[in-house]
Amino acid sequence: MGSPEGEEAVVATAAVVEDGLRGNGDGGGGGVGEVVGVGRSIDMEWRKAEEAAIRRYEAANWLRRVVGVVCGKDLAEEPSEEEFRLGLRNGIVLCNALNKVQPGSVPKVVEAPSDSADGAALCAYQYFENVRNFLMGLQDLGLPTFEASDLEKGGKGVRVVDCVLSLRSFSESKQVGRSAPLKYGGILKPSMSGKHFIRKNSEPFVKTMVRSYSAELLRDGVSLEQSLGLDFSLEHVERTTPDSIRMLVQTMLSDKKPEEIPSLVESLLSRVIHEFERRTANQNESVKHALDPNDDKLLSRADTPPEMESTCTCSTGNMDEEDHTSVSMKEEVSTAVLVNGENVVEHIQAKQTDKYFDQQQKHIKDLKSNLATMKSGMEHIKLQYSEDLDKLGKHVHTLSHAASGYHKVLEENRKLYNQIQDLRGNIRVYCRVRPFLPGKVSSSSSVAGLEDRTITVMTPSKHGKDARKSFTFNRVFGPLATQEQVFADMQPLIRSVLDGYNVCIFAYGQTGSGKTFTMSGPKVLTEEGLGVNYRALNDLFNIQAQRKDTFCYEISVQMIEIYNEQVRDLLQNETVDIKNSSQKGIAVPDANIVPVTSTSDVIDLMNLGQKNRAVCSTAMNDRSSRSHSCLTVHVQGRDLTSRTVLRGCMHLVDLAGSERVDKSEVVGDRLKEAQHINKSLAALGDVIASLAQKNAHVPYRNSKLTQLLQDSLGGQAKTLMFVHIAPEPDAIGESISTLKFAERVATVELGAAKSNKEGGEVKELKEQIACLKAALAKKDGETESIRSTQSSPDIYRMRMGSAPPAFRNPMEEVGNLETRSNGTPRQKKRNFELPDVENDTSSWLDTSSQKEAALGEWVNNSQFGSSNSLLELGPDATQDVVFYQRNSPEPQWSWAGSVATEDSDDFEVTTSCSSEQDMVRPTSAPKAPGSANGSASIARKAQPKGAKSTDIRSTNPAKRAAPLQKKINGPPSASTKNGKQLSLSAADGKRAPNGKVSAKK
């Protein structure tokens, strides 16, 4: 393009560019350019204002987050330009923000008074000091700054906003740890913005690269020529065109948004091409008109553009040469434009690609470095974690070992503690705190603290301060304790029933404290809500099934209530009486006893009992129990191997709650019920107090309740009291009274409980005794004739010591006697009536054959001819026969003479649970009425045949006696006292007022 024609074409191109730029920037030009220019001018002004406001809001919000409130003032979220300038005018906000981003950048910030109004000017020194320090800090960081005058009215607030946003960008880059150079002066936009690269498929990649790169350079204030190093063949343009063209381009593009620059460049290029096409077409038209002979030359010159006049004038000679010249010039212009455009695109693409690759390489290096650092860090952390885990594992192992040892020791301590409790016979006391009722949850509770065995309650103080008092029991359960947890702690106590022990568990507390819930459960039974009654019987059934190969158990239940001092059977709804001396330890024998074999049977019986129980609604409890309920479980077990019989009894008592009449608001029958309840509970308190003080007299009979619990509280059972308290603050008085009573109960020592166990041999011997008693009753009638024929001299002679001596051996076991065979033969004593001895003294000298015949007759009559016979005589027992022989042609043996007397050790018979004195009586007895005055003794009359045998009042094996074979041994000793021998009737004989002996009924 060194020819004059090429230079002129370039000049024309520059002119078109200048016209296009001026048309876009100033609104000049005609046609479509003017319309587009005006529309874009209006739109640009609006966009610029909106962008400035958005950037100002962003700067203000960032300052609000970083600095906060300064001098009691705060920047608005969306400040105007004036508000923004006034807020930053004193420089305090700017200095504080800079110190937040880069600590220590401004060593001293001059603070303004807190009461200064907005916009109030500081002194010149303060103003200059803060702003100068801020600008110096920005310069040290390499950030763009502004002039101090920009903070004054009429200053350029845009530069202040750009400065704040650049500081924000620096802060963000510092937080994320970016090391790449950043560009400041507005919102931080990465050089490879994804927004520019996400284009439509129809837009070439080259245009995208050009637009992105051009937008960044123009935002940084760098000219297109300086950035690209290209001149677009502008060397010729600079020689022929003024510098205002370049300034115009820079001015127009510097105020545009990055996204608007590509469209502006496209519009400029399209106008240049359009202008070239238009001028080329005009030139062709001019040439055609010039070749037309009819046209005037002046007209042709007028229509020809000025740039082509010289060409047309110089080519008047040869029209083909002119046409060739114009065509070649058009091609050269088009080629120059295309070549320059391609070179620009290629250069931009190459430079952008190189820059992109450099950045990517740098990023890759940074990533590799970071990856290596992270790997080494992870290895170090992994090693450290491994060491820490090893240490932690060893520590956990040590703790688990210590914890297992602690739990083991704790369990051993608990077992030892329970053993001590069993030996001492203390009443176990458990405490349970009821949770707040639904809908009555209170923010405050009277319970201040709960531990395993200690409860602390808040007590009202006289000085207005809450005092605390602690109580210690065997176990304390909080409001969150479940029914299963409560039962698990008392389960060993309940299971001891199967071992033959008596157990008593009773719930105590004020009304509405949860006693019935603990013992029976909620109104609607669920598996989780089953109370102690159901769980205890279910546990007994399970153990019964487990021991079915070794033990045979029979379980039966009673259910009674004490209502207004009347004992009622809940299973029959009848009134019954309490008999503490009844058989087999049953306190209420008249109550219905129902055998049970499964939990369903128990549930049916409990439902029936609860249905018949007296329950009423009061102001304190909608389901208040108006009576004391007692579920008694009787267990009788038999060892299949040793035939040992075990008997156990368990009382599960749900006491009615104590209540205050003013709170329960009861009247009429309810008031009477409350009075009886409080009276019986007071009697229980008196019994506990007497037991705690170890008084000789304990007032059990003051109430039906204490009379029912006499066996349990008197030392014959393992006893547990379950106290219940309510957590409401208004019930603190009743709670403290309940806890004090429970604390006193815990000090009571009842002694070790005894197991109700009897061996198989003892049971058989008792059965034999019962049979002997029955036979004795039948033979009592036959002794009447023998007693009437006895003479009084025989009685006198027997009392004076002429009777054969008798011997007593020490008692080794109650009911178990043995006869020794080493020594002098011993005569067995028999009970003889005084008339029998007096009438016939020759009976002392009967022969051995007569004795054997009489003995055989006795065996036949008593129906005990088997090996179980009570009398077994050895070969050397001839003297015994002489002692028992009667002098009669047909001797008759009295049954009373074949049974041991109370003075003899041959046979002893127990008749009641309190008959130890009956089994072995003193050797002294009242004298016969006839012996005092020397007259003949009065003949005794025997008991009629129809007399019944004595009832057995107790089945306690320790209280029973059974006959065993006894051998003869030892030296003779007289069984006389004061020279007079005693004469008693049968074991159960009782002297009548007339001197006769009759069987005890």
UniProtKB/Swiss-Prot annotation:
Record-listed ATP binding positions: 509-516
Pfam families in alphabetical order: CH, Kinesin
Recorded coiled-coil stretches: 756-784
GO BP annotations, alphabetical order: microtubule-based movement; microtubule-based process
GO molecular function: ATP binding; microtubule binding; microtubule motor activity
Residues of the Calponin-homology (CH) domain: 53-172
UniProt-listed Gene3D superfamilies: Calponin-like domain (1.10.418.10), Kinesin motor domain (3.40.850.10)
InterPro entries: CH_dom, CH_dom_sf, Kinesin-like_fam, Kinesin_motor_dom, Kinesin_motor_dom_sf, P-loop_NTPase
Record field: compositional bias (Basic and acidic residues): 284-300
Residue stretches making up the Kinesin motor domain: 426-748
Keyword terms of this UniProt record: ATP-binding, Coiled coil, Microtubule, Motor protein, Nucleotide-binding
A single cellular component GO annotation: microtubule cytoskeleton
Domain of life the protein comes from: Eukaryota
Bias (Polar residues) ranges: 972-984
Region Disordered, residue ranges: 284-322, 804-830, 890-1001
Recorded family membership: Belongs to the TRAFAC class myosin-kinesin ATPase superfamily. Kinesin family. KIN-14 subfamily.
Protein name: Kinesin-like protein KIN-14P
